[in-house]
Swiss-Prot record:
NDH-1 shuttles electrons from NADH, via FMN and iron-sulfur (Fe-S) centers, to quinones in the respiratory chain. The immediate electron acceptor for the enzyme in this species is believed to be a menaquinone. Couples the redox reaction to proton translocation (for every two electrons transferred, four hydrogen ions are translocated across the cytoplasmic membrane), and thus conserves the redox energy in a proton gradient. One of its GO terms (cellular component) is plasma membrane. HAMAP family: NDH1_NuoC. GO terms for molecular function: NADH dehydrogenase (ubiquinone) activity; NADH:ubiquinone reductase (non-electrogenic) activity; quinone binding. This is NADH-quinone oxidoreductase subunit C. It comes from Mycolicibacterium vanbaalenii (strain DSM 7251 / JCM 13017 / BCRC 16820 / KCTC 9966 / NRRL B-24157 / PYR-1) (Mycobacterium vanbaalenii). It catalyses: a quinone + NADH + 5 H(+)(in) = a quinol + NAD(+) + 4 H(+)(out).
């Protein structure tokens, strides 16, 4: 996402070309394209629809001061409400979203890892889509951690269905979910080095002979950012 159409976007980097590739020629026709890489900024009130009701109910349940310390930013982007939450407050916020009768987000639908190498001190993100069956509502909570300290509290005791989702996010992105009952790799071998869905993970591969020419593996001829 570029975020250029959002209020006060947070610019975290610059992308050159169609795909941000480096190390070889660009065949897309967009080699000179330069775009800012930005995350959506905080959204102003009113958020629209039921989003205001959700934010107001959460602030009322937590208390104004705790809400201000817990929720770093409220973002409405492409008709989705995301609450960016401080990682130390993640469990308390999630439990309130689940248990408060005015909120009742009973289901956590998964965990998505995201790697933003240019988001200084917030390179690793985890996103949790939540659903309220009681009120027929959907929101997301998002939490960030730095590469140097990739620890996030596990939501297993609040939403047990996050069990394998957190394991997969750990496996592919290296986020460590503190308090998880069995945080081990779930798809890659136990002795695998690195986390394959991070943007700094080498593409890998082997040399290939094609029409008499030897083509080097992808990680030697091109890198993406």
């Amino acid at each position: 996402m570029t975020g250029d159409d959002e209020p006060d976007p947070e610019v975290i980097g610059v992308r050159r070309g169609m795909f941000g590739a480096k190390g070889s020629g660009d065949t897309s026709g967009y080699g000179r394209l330069i775009r800012s890489v930005a995350l959506p900024g905080s959204s102003p009130r009113p958020y629209g629809g039921y989003f205001d009701d959700v934010v107001d109910a959460l602030e009322s349940a937590l208390g104004h001061d705790v809400f201000a310390e817990s929720v770093e930013r409220v973002v409405v982007y492409r008709d989705e409400l995301t609450l960016e939450v401080h990682r130390d407050r993640l469990v308390d916020v999630a439990q309130t979203l689940r248990d408060d009768p005015d909120l009742r987000f009973e289901l956590c639908l998964g965990v998505s890892g995201v790697h933003y190498p240019d988001d200084a001190d917030r390179e690793l993100h985890a996103v949790y889509p939540l659903m309220s069956i009681t009120h027929n509502r959907r929101i997301r909570i998002e939490v960030a951690a730095p590469d140097s300290d990739p620890h996030i509290p596990s939501l297993f005791r609040v939403y047990p269905t996050t069990d394998w989702h957190e394991r997969e996010t750990y496996d592919f992105f290296g986020l460590i979910f503190d308090g998880h009952p069995a945080l081990t790799r779930i798809e890659m071998p136990d002795d695998w080095v690195g986390h394959p869905q991070r943007k700094d993970y080498p593409l890998g591969g082997i040399p290939v002979e094609y029409h008499g020419a030897e083509i080097p593996p992808p990680d030697e001829r091109r890198a993406y950012s």
